[in-house]
Amino acid sequence: MNADGPVVNVHVLFFAKSRELANTPRSKVDLPTEITASDLLELLVSKFGLTPIRDNLILAHNESYIDNLSERILFKEGDELAIIPPLSGG
C-alpha cells in the first residue's frame, strides 16, 4: 500500500461476527484511492481485530463482492465497504 498517495474516506459496514469483533456496526476509514484486495484485507484485519475470522471474510465494495484478492480496488470519497463473515445456519 502506498501511504504517500491520495487517500479517501470510506464507510465500512460490519456484519455478524465481524461486527462483534470490531465492536461497532460501522466505521469510517481513510484508504488509498487504489489498493489490492489482499492489502485491503490485511489492513482491515489489523485495524479492526478480525484475525479470528480472517480466512473466512467476504468483502464487498459498493455492494459488489470482491472475488479475487489480486484485484485492484479503486476507491472514491464516500464509497462503501462491507465486511461479511460466512453466515451459519441450519
UniProtKB/Swiss-Prot annotation:
Heterotetramer; composed of 2 small (Mocs2A) and 2 large (Mocs2B) subunits. The gene is Mocs2A. This is Molybdopterin synthase sulfur carrier subunit. Belongs to the MoaD family. MOCS2A subfamily. It holds the Pfam family ThiS. It is found in: Cytoplasm. Pathway: Cofactor biosynthesis; molybdopterin biosynthesis. GO terms for cellular component: cytosol; molybdopterin adenylyltransferase complex; molybdopterin synthase complex. One of its GO terms (molecular function) is nucleotide binding. The keyword Nucleotide-binding applies. The keyword Transport does not apply. One of its GO terms (biological process) is Mo-molybdopterin cofactor biosynthetic process. C-terminal thiocarboxylation occurs in 2 steps, it is first acyl-adenylated (-COAMP) via the hesA/moeB/thiF part of MOCS3, then thiocarboxylated (-COSH) via the rhodanese domain of MOCS3. Keywords: Cytoplasm, Molybdenum cofactor biosynthesis, Nucleotide-binding, Phosphoprotein. The modification Glycyl adenylate is found at residue 90. This protein is produced by a bicistronic gene which also produces the large subunit (Mocs2B). Acts as a sulfur carrier required for molybdopterin biosynthesis. Component of the molybdopterin synthase complex that catalyzes the conversion of precursor Z into molybdopterin by mediating the incorporation of 2 sulfur atoms into precursor Z to generate a dithiolene group. In the complex, serves as sulfur donor by being thiocarboxylated (-COSH) at its C-terminus by MOCS3. After interaction with Mocs2B, the sulfur is then transferred to precursor Z to form molybdopterin. The modification 1-thioglycine is found at residue 90. PANTHER family: MOLYBDOPTERIN SYNTHASE SULFUR CARRIER SUBUNIT. It comes from the Eukaryota.
